[in-house]
């Protein structure tokens, strides 16, 4: 349980860092690219795997890691935009309620059961994402793009969770998770560098030194949030469904508190209802999976 609490705290802190990027005028994409370099280096350095760099492309999970790297950098940027445009609570709920996508995939692909209570949880999660997307009273969102960000984050995060589970269970051998994770971060970094080089060629790139510091600040907790979640999942007696749902509920609540007390974010009644519905939905799903 200690590992899970650490993961919740670190993951919630990621949303705070994204918000600070906006406050300090740090280029979000540049910082995210550096973040993935930092996370990849940490992963390769701390991995005890004897596989050499030359052998990584030959691993059965490499293609999956490459695709996940693309999704990681895309969704991470959407998460940053959602935190900055819609607030911490909207970003956290949109990303963490995407657990319902993994559940639907499990029912379809792994032929897991779908009870009435689980179905209620899925429906309530979708309602929660909608309610927390409201920014002002009596209005959904003044800018349609601002409403689009939470929706993209919801489906993008769900795609990552589902793909991670599929690739890890199908292709990653025991003890290979650190190297697999580091490879995902490395692929995301390479893609980010390609985009930065393109921006340099067309003359739209002005790299800022503070982006490096911002990326390091983001990369270290980003890596360890995954490490401690994996440690929590490997704890004896800790069911994966319980760990994931508790992790999601904790991040939603804690990131909302961060938004309220650190950035003075204002939540209208619909937002509070949405957050409450989110907690109820994920508790229902956890209850079914017990």
Q: What are the residue ranges of the model-derived segments?
A:
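Structural signature of hydrophobic alpha-helical transmembrane segments
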Residues: 1-11, 55-72, 111-127, 150, ...
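Small-residue-mediated transmembrane helix hinge/kink sites in multi-pass secondary transporters
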Residues: 19, 80, 106-107, 165, ...
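Juxtamembrane helix-loop boundary signature in multi-pass membrane transporters
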Residues: 1-5, 100-166, 270, 275-290
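Membrane-interface interhelical linkers
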Residues: 1-66, 76-85, 136-153, 186-235, ...
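Alpha-helical transmembrane segments of compact multi-pass small-molecule transporters, enriched
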Residues: 38-42, 94-108, 123, 187, ...
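Structural motif at transmembrane-helix junctions in multi-pass transporters
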Residues: 27, 78-94, 172-178, 229-247
């Amino acid at each position: 349980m200690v590992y899970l609490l650490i993961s919740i705290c670190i993951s919630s802190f990621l949303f705070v860092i994204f918000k600070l990027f906006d406050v300090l005028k740090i280029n979000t994409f540049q910082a995210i690219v550096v973040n993935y370099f930092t996370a990849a280096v940490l992963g390769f350095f701390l991995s005890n795997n004897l596989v050499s760099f030359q052998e990584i492309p030959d691993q059965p999970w490499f293609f999956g890691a490459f695709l996940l790297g693309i999704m990681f950098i895309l969704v991470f940027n959407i998460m940053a935009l959602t935190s900055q445009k819609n607030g911490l609570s909207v970003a956290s709920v949109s990303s963490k309620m995407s657990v319902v996508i993994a559940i639907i995939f499990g029912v379809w692909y792994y032929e897991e059961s779908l009870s009435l209570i689980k179905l209620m949880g899925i429906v309530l999660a979708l309602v929660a994402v909608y309610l927390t997307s409201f920014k002002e009273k009596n209005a959904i969102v003044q800018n349609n793009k601002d409403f689009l960000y939470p929706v993209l984050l919801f489906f993008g995060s769900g795609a990552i969770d589902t793909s991670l589970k599929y690739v890890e269970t199908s292709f990653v051998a025991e003890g290979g998770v650190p190297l697999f994770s580091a490879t995902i971060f490395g692929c995301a970094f390479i893609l980010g560098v390609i985009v930065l080089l393109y921006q340099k060629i067309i003359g739209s790139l002005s790299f800022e030194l503070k982006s490096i510091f911002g990326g390091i600040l983001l990369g270290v907790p980003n890596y360890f949030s995954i490490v401690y979640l994996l440690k929590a999942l490997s704890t004896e007696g800790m069911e994966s469904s319980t760990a994931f749902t508790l992790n999601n509920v904790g991040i939603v609540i804690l990131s909302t508190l961060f938004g309220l007390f650190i950035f003075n974010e204002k939540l209208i009644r619909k937002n509070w209802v949405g957050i409450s519905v989110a907690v109820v939905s994920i508790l229902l799903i956890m209850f079914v999976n017990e």
